[in-house]
Each structure stands twice: as C-alpha cells, then as structure tokens.
Amino acid sequence: MPQLDTSTWLTTILSMFLALFIIFQLKISKYDFYHNPELTAKMLKHNTPWETKWTKIYLPLLLPL
C-alpha cells in the first residue's frame, strides 16, 4: 500500500491562507466607513422614569425558596 505524500501540504495550506486573506481584504476594502462618527451622530438624551429612581434588581438565585 503506497504512502501518502504530504510534502506539498504546507505550500498548499499557506497559499490557501494567503488567498483567503487577500479575498477578505478586497471584500472589506469595498465598504465605506465614516472617519469620525462622533461628529455626525448626535445622541439625544431621553429621560426615562427608571433613571431618576432607585431600583433594586433581584437575581433568580437570591429569591427565597
């Protein structure tokens, strides 16, 4: 029974990783990202009732049996 020749596997795997890296870089480079999103998007502060009150959070494990 002949043995499996694995001498070219390293070259194949490395070239596959290089090709995938290049493909993903090309895909990502097509997106248009904003340079400074803080200047364009202004957050509006909404006052909600639970922000002004003290609330207690009960965890399920702390409830009495």
Swiss-Prot record:
Q: Which GO terms describe its molecular function?
A: proton transmembrane transporter activity
Which gene holds the coding sequence for this protein? MT-ATP8
Chaperone as UniProt keyword: no
Question: What family name appears in the similarity comment?
Answer: Belongs to the ATPase protein 8 family.
Keywords of this protein's UniProt record, alphabetized? Answer: Acetylation, ATP synthesis, CF(0), Hydrogen ion transport, Ion transport, Membrane, Mitochondrion, Transmembrane, Transmembrane helix, Transport
What is the predominant subcellular site recorded for this chain? mitochondrion
Quote the Pfam families the UniProt record gives: ATP-synt_8 (PF00895)
- Residues found modified as N6-succinyllysine: 53
How does the record describe its quaternary structure?
A: Component of the ATP synthase complex composed at least of ATP5F1A/subunit alpha, ATP5F1B/subunit beta, ATP5MC1/subunit c (homooctomer), MT-ATP6/subunit a, MT-ATP8/subunit 8, ATP5ME/subunit e, ATP5MF/subunit f, ATP5MG/subunit g, ATP5MK/subunit k, ATP5MJ/subunit j, ATP5F1C/subunit gamma, ATP5F1D/subunit delta, ATP5F1E/subunit epsilon, ATP5PF/subunit F6, ATP5PB/subunit b, ATP5PD/subunit d, ATP5PO/subunit OSCP.
- Physiological role: Subunit 8, of the mitochondrial membrane ATP synthase complex (F(1)F(0) ATP synthase or Complex V) that produces ATP from ADP in the presence of a proton gradient across the membrane which is generated by electron transport complexes of the respiratory chain. ATP synthase complex consist of a soluble F(1) head domain - the catalytic core - and a membrane F(1) domain - the membrane proton channel. These two domains are linked by a central stalk rotating inside the F(1) region and a stationary peripheral stalk.
| Disulfide bonding pattern of the chain | none
For the modification N6-acetyllysine, the affected residues are 53, 56
Question: Which GO cellular component does the record give, naming just one?
Answer: mitochondrial membrane
Q: What is this protein called?
A: ATP synthase F(0) complex subunit 8
Cell compartments where the protein resides: Mitochondrion membrane
List residues traversing the bilayer: 8-24
What organism does the UniProt record list as the source?
Answer: Capra hircus
Q: GO:BP terms for this protein?
A: proton motive force-driven ATP synthesis
Question: What membrane topology was assigned to this protein in its record?
Answer: Single-pass membrane protein
